[in-house]
């Protein structure tokens, strides 16, 4: 009935104030009789009630104005107007094609070229901005050195020979990547979580230990130092002091958090105050499941030390649980578990998860269709941003990724894919509506091995980490190259693209006879249909056979 707390408390004030005034006039206090004692008691209760409503109204008004003001200040023309690295934001066109069903019948033998969606729309991306600073790794190494006296597991970050100099250690053994960010409009800042990895042997893909670090940026992506949030003692930038399971093995390797993904979590606390906080999902090895890789959630501003392992009801832990893509639906924390589309709903207090949509967990349906995996968080598209005839469903937009082997001259290729999922507002069943071809945001990733060409290196890694900001036709995306960078691009025209695609497929969204599980499997499979064509073209246009750095 009420769309916001402000509307609710406004209505209460309008209702209660006149009633209270009438009561005070009808039953005035005259003397100290028994009747007047009752009137006095009731008037005190009414006064307290009105004061509480007024307090809640003012608090809701402050939050609402803070939200509106922050959003307005953030989006004058572009989501990013200036940064330390870049002044004017220049955009260049990007070609995106994908796959969706319109009137095709989903069959196991369906050809991917029959469900291509290839509209020539004005999608554009900015140049990439580097969010890592040269001094970041030294800062976080120094911070860990300070914290060693409080937590001896941090000693594992300092297993270097006495003759090694710090500059060489940082260059060969330390990495900062997987930067996932979210906009906290109540505070007018971006919260960003990073993975800080240390490898005793200098092998990036087999680190000794990893820990999460937090940074805060203003609306223009300028880092804020000494930043604190209400209800939290952490001061940013900082190492996030979450629990790290060190296992039972004598050799300590690949410990700690990997692949962090952050989303906005909002709730009302026991004092009636609306809270905004970052909620982080990550995977890590855990002794609770016999040293298997498990998913966890972490709320650094709520409890900076506690992590909660996620478990699926009636489903034994797999050897590796990873790549769950988080999103919020109402007050629920959900995850895209895998493709064909399975959705989990998880309790943030105890980590218990239930499958709420998608095929059952069994050997056959559990096989992943194609190469598609979870990538970023998913963000809900506001209903008011869509035409009225599309508002019977809720939609979420995100960026998945694929891992492809033997693609042209490259042995291993990781690339993003735009995805769109939805559900009818009267149902809990989610559907995968669209998946794009491989995209790269016009970025030519750094080679895995410095000094080599992409072809001679044989590995090209571009991982989307977060949809950090989304508003109208703009979005900001963070990504990493070669497991060693944190970068940001802005895109515009994305909402127009999605709206046109939904217009194209709207009749299919109403078709209750369709098979969403099979369609999801086919869309996932088709996502890499043109991979070989992409790699051949990229070799020529991006110079994969030439040294670029």
Curated annotation (Swiss-Prot):
| Gene name for this UniProt entry | BMT3
Q: Its family?
A: Belongs to the BMT family.
* Pfam families referenced in this protein's UniProt entry, alphabetically: BMT
Task: Return one GO MF term.
Answer: mannosyltransferase activity
Stated membrane topology is: Single-pass type II membrane protein
A biological process (GO) of this protein is: beta-1,2-oligomannoside biosynthetic process
> Which source organism?
Candida albicans (strain SC5314 / ATCC MYA-2876) (Yeast)
Q: Which residues lie on this side of the membrane: Extracellular?
A: 59-549
This protein is called what? Answer: Beta-mannosyltransferase 3
């Amino acid at each position: 009935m009420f769309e916001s707390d402000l509307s609710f408390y406004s209505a209460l004030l309008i209702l209660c104030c006149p009633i209270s005034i009438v009561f005070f006039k009808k039953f005035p206090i005259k003397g100290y009789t028994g009747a007047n004692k009752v009137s006095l008691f009731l008037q005190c209760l009414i006064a307290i009630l009105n004061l509480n409503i007024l307090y809640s109204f003012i608090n809701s008004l402050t939050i609402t104005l803070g939200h509106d003001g922050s959003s307005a200040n953030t989006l004058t023309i572009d989501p990013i107007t200036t940064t330390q690295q870049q002044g004017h934001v220049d955009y260049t066109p990007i070609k995106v094609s994908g796959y969706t069903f319109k009137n095709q019948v989903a069959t196991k033998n369906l050809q991917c070229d029959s469900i291509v969606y290839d509209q020539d729309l004005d999608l554009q991306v900015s140049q990439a901005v580097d969010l890592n600073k040269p001094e970041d790794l030294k800062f976080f190494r120094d911070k860990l050195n300070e914290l060693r006296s409080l937590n001896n597991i941090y000693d594992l970050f300092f297993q270097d020979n006495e003759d090694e100099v710090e500059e060489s250690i940082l260059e060969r053994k330390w990495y900062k990547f997987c930067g996932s960010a979210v906009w906290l409009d109540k505070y007018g800042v971006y919260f960003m979580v990073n993975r800080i990895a240390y490898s005793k042997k200098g092998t990036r893909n087999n680190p000794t230990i990893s820990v999460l670090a937090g940074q805060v940026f203003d609306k223009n992506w300028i880092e804020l130092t000494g930043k604190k949030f209400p209800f939290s003692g952490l001061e940013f930038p900082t190492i996030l002091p979450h629990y790290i399971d060190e296992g039972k093995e004598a050799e300590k390797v690949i410990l700690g958090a990997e692949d962090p993904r952050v989303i906005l979590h909002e709730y009302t606390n026991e004092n009636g105050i609306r809270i905004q906080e970052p909620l982080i999902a990550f995977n890590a090895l855990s002794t609770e499941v016999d040293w298997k890789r498990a998913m966890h959630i972490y709320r650094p501003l709520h409890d900076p030390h506690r992590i909660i392992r996620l478990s699926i009801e009636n489903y034994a832990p797999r050897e590796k649980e990873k790549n769950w893509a988080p999103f919020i639906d109402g007050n629920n924390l959900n995850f895209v578990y895998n493709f064909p589309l399975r959705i989990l709903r998880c309790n943030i207090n105890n980590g218990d998860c239930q499958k709420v949509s998608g095929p059952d967990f069994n050997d056959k349906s559990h096989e992943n269709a194609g190469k598609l995996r979870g990538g970023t968080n998913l963000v809900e598209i506001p209903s008011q941003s869509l035409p009225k005839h599309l508002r019977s469903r809720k939609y979420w937009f995100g960026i998945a990724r694929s891992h492809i082997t033997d693609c042209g001259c490259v042995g291993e290729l990781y690339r993003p894919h735009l995805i769109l999922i939805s559900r009818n507002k009267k149902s809990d069943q989610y559907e995968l509506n669209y998946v794009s071809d491989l995209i790269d945001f016009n970025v030519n990733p750094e080679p895995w091995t410095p000094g080599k060409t992409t072809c001679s290196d044989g590995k090209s890694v571009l991982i989307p980490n977060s949809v950090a900001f989304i508003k109208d036709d703009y979005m900001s995306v963070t990504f990493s190259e070669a497991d060693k960078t944190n970068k940001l691009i802005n895109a515009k025209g994305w909402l127009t693209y999605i709206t046109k695609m939904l217009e194209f497929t709207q009749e299919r969204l109403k078709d209750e006879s369709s098979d969403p599980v099979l369609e999801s499997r086919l869309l996932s499979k088709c996502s890499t249909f043109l991979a070989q064509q992409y790699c051949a073209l990229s070799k020529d246009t991006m110079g994969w056979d030439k040294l670029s750095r």
